[in-house]
Curated annotation (Swiss-Prot):
Pfam families reported for this sequence: Ribosomal_L3
Domain of life: Archaea
InterPro entries assigned to the protein according to its UniProt record, in alphabetical order: L3_arc_euk (IPR045077), Ribosomal_L3_dom_3_arc_sf (IPR044892), Ribosomal_uL3 (IPR000597), Ribosomal_uL3_arc (IPR019928), Ribosomal_uL3_CS (IPR019926), Transl_B-barrel_sf (IPR009000)
GO cellular component annotations of the record: cytosolic large ribosomal subunit
Function description: One of the primary rRNA binding proteins, it binds directly near the 3'-end of the 23S rRNA, where it nucleates assembly of the 50S subunit.
Quaternary structure (record): Part of the 50S ribosomal subunit. Forms a cluster with proteins L14 and L24e.
Recorded family membership: Belongs to the universal ribosomal protein uL3 family.
Single GO term (MF): structural constituent of ribosome
Keyword flag RNA-binding: yes
Keywords noted in UniProt: Ribonucleoprotein, Ribosomal protein, RNA-binding, rRNA-binding
Name this protein carries in UniProt: Large ribosomal subunit protein uL3
Species assigned in the record: Staphylothermus marinus (strain ATCC 43588 / DSM 3639 / JCM 9404 / F1)
Biological process, per Gene Ontology: translation
Length: 395
């Protein structure tokens, strides 16, 4: 005699409680890998990686990009030990708009015997010259950008002042209308170099005026430097201060990365959608309601494990080991006809990832070297046979 199974595993993970809205839309990175992808390749593959020009070196362990949209591609499957290895397969791909980032400052850390890493000092330097240089190098011949270098710098400084008024002050009679306050950055840098630091990190800024979003306010994030010795990392950070970094200086085609960001918000939802609770059939006592869990608890009070309605989505989450299919400098190579829906045109550098990732379009995402990499370490990206440029309207 058939009957319903009354016992089942619980619905919904308890590992992501509390299911509340993220505090900030720009995620804070709580942990960094101890080795960069380049260090892992040399360690695991040895001469095979060295012959490809890969060597351990100081490198930023993270980058920032905006989610533009999705398409699909046909590639040659280069994964070993799969039944499609060496054959053409169709895969979904996600395109990220990845304009260069500006290194506004450095932050040195010392170790406190009781509290761990504590900030020792900061150095800030104007990125205006670097912004003009990267515009002339990457975006000046772009037919879709109608702004000049002067307008780009002015809009960036105006947006940066809204984020941190202490860094930029208005100067109506100057070339850009604003001035970046450096405040003796050379003396502060020498003080940092003379101190016995335990770690040094960069303070990076996005350049949204060069993306397809159309906003001016940049995001500021701290990024750790990995690889090499501490003195090599300090020298590398000194070279980056006040300059720009492109995505191909941080990542390599074919490697795996982690995606950190805030998921798409769903608002206030019930237990069926929020936890996947079994919806029982409506019977003659349906006046008591359907799509509910019935009794929440015994009389002593509600248990926290019981599914209840509430906020769904807009949570800070991390996705591990997403593979980079391609890194390019001309965004119109991957922009479909009519642009990405709800985003528009990718003007400059971009990243193509295998599969889907968290967040809606235009969401800021932090890309990090893998903190728990897989057992397979590919040296190259798979061969792309076809990429779909067809319009996504109505799909």
């Amino acid at each position: 005699m058939g009957h319903r199974k009354y016992s089942a595993p619980r619905h919904g993970s308890l590992g992501v409680r509390p299911r509340k809205r993220a505090a900030k839309i720009v995620p804070r990175i709580r942990s960094w890998p101890t080795q960069s992808w380049f260090d892992l390749l040399v360690e695991k593959l040895g001469d095979e990686a060295v012959n490809k020009g890969i060597a351990p070196k100081p490198v930023l362990l993270g980058y920032v990009a905006y989610k533009a949209g999705m398409s699909h591609a046909i590639i040659i499957d280069d994964r070993p030990h799969t039944f499609t290895s060496g054959k053409e397969i169709a895969i979904p791909v996600t395109v990220l708009d990845a304009p260069p980032i500006l290194i506004l400052g450095l932050r040195g850390y010392k170790i406190h015997p009781m509290h761990g890493l504590l900030s020792f000092g900061e150095v800030w330097r104007s990125p205006v010259e670097a912004l003009k240089e990267l515009y002339e190098k990457i975006y000046s011949d772009n037919p879709f950008i109608n702004l000049g270098a002067k307008d780009i710098v002015r809009k960036y400084l105006k947006g940066l002042r809204k984020v941190n008024p202490g860094l930029v002050k208005p100067e109506p009679h100057s070339e850009y209308g604003f001035k970046f306050l450096e405040n003796n950055w050379k003396e502060k840098l020498e003080r940092l170099k003379a101190a016995e630091l335990a770690d040094i990190r960069v303070i990076a800024s996005t350049i949204p005026v060069l993306s397809g979003i159309g906003k001016k306010k940049p995001e500021i994030i701290e990024i750790k430097i990995g690889g090499g010795t501490l003195s090599e990392r300090i020298d590398y950070a000194e070279k980056l201060l006040g300059n720009y970094v492109t995505v191909d200086q941080v990542f390599r085609e074919g490697q795996f990365i982690d995606i950190i960001g805030v998921t798409k918000g769903k608002g206030f939802q019930g237990v069926i959608k929020r936890f996947g609770v079994k919806e029982l059939p409506r019977w003659h006592k349906h006046r008591k309601g359907s799509r509910k869990i019935g009794s929440r608890s015994p009389g002593f009070g509600t248990m926290s494990e019981t599914p209840q309605p509430g906020q769904m989505g807009f949570h800070r989450r991390t996705e591990y080991n997403k593979r980079i299919i391609k890194i390019g400098i001309n965004g119109w190579e991957v922009t479909p006809k009519g642009g990405f829906l709800g985003y528009g045109i990718v003007y400059g550098p971009y990243i193509m990832l295998h599969g889907s990732i968290i967040g809606p379009r235009k969401r800021l995402l932090v890309l990090r070297h893998p903190i728990r990499p897989p057992s397979w370490y590919p040296l190259e990206a798979p061969q792309i046979i076809y990429y779909s440029h067809e319009s996504k309207q109505g799909v």
